Amino acid sequence: MSGSAVSKRYASALFDIANESAQLNQVEEELIVVKQVFQNEKALNDVLNHPKVPAAKKKELIQNAFGSLSQSVLNTIFLLIDRHRAAIVPELTDEFIKLANVARQTEDAIVYSVKPLTDAEMLPLSQVFAKKAGVASLRIRNEVQTDLIGGIKVRIGNRIYDGSVSGKLQRIERQLAGENR
């Protein structure tokens, strides 16, 4: 079974547990932290993926590092360690977030702008683009990109809505280049 299929199964099982115990938000937040640590700490990955380190030592390391995690997240990580699949934690996290977003009718969006946007500026963007995306709400993360010149660019999943000045200039350039052929 491929890694993504495996991570989907574990994510689905963890999602069911979190949903039944009304801990969806908490489990999602914990998984995001765990994913960041797994991605940023090469030494941790080396230990978790080393075949000569016993599973009990790996679990002890996780327990000491992430002792405050909910039992369902800890047990999932322990199960992954037992099955030599600790490396799929980042994928599992992404799949869990997708399932949680579907359940909440929410989607994640990135708004690129020339300057940081205030909450008052992001609220109408969230409302307008939630309708375009066909979801109840958007969780917006703002990233500053000075090369936009002005305006904004919104990325929701694999869709991009480009209302930036640089994007408009590029479209005009393509049109003019097409007419001059």
From Swiss-Prot:
PANTHER family: ATP SYNTHASE DELTA CHAIN. Keywords: ATP synthesis, Cell membrane, CF(1), Hydrogen ion transport, Ion transport, Membrane, Transport. It is found in: Cell membrane; Membrane raft. It is a peripheral membrane protein. Pfam families: OSCP. F-type ATPases have 2 components, F(1) - the catalytic core - and F(0) - the membrane proton channel. F(1) has five subunits: alpha(3), beta(3), gamma(1), delta(1), epsilon(1). F(0) has three main subunits: a(1), b(2) and c(10-14). The alpha and beta chains form an alternating ring which encloses part of the gamma chain. F(1) is attached to F(0) by a central stalk formed by the gamma and epsilon chains, while a peripheral stalk is formed by the delta and b chains. The F(1)F(0) complex interacts with SpoIIIJ and YqjG; YqgA is found in the same complex. Interacts with FloT. This is ATP synthase subunit delta. Signal peptide: none annotated. F(1)F(0) ATP synthase produces ATP from ADP in the presence of a proton or sodium gradient. F-type ATPases consist of two structural domains, F(1) containing the extramembraneous catalytic core and F(0) containing the membrane proton channel, linked together by a central stalk and a peripheral stalk. During catalysis, ATP synthesis in the catalytic domain of F(1) is coupled via a rotary mechanism of the central stalk subunits to proton translocation. This protein is part of the stalk that links CF(0) to CF(1). It either transmits conformational changes from CF(0) to CF(1) or is implicated in proton conduction. The lineage of its organism: Bacteria, Bacillati, Bacillota, Bacilli, Bacillales. GO terms for biological process: proton motive force-driven ATP synthesis. GO terms for molecular function: proton-transporting ATP synthase activity, rotational mechanism. The keyword Mitochondrion does not apply. It comes from Bacillus subtilis (strain 168). Its main location: membrane. Transmembrane segments: none annotated. The keyword Transport applies. One of its GO terms (cellular component) is membrane raft. Belongs to the ATPase delta chain family.
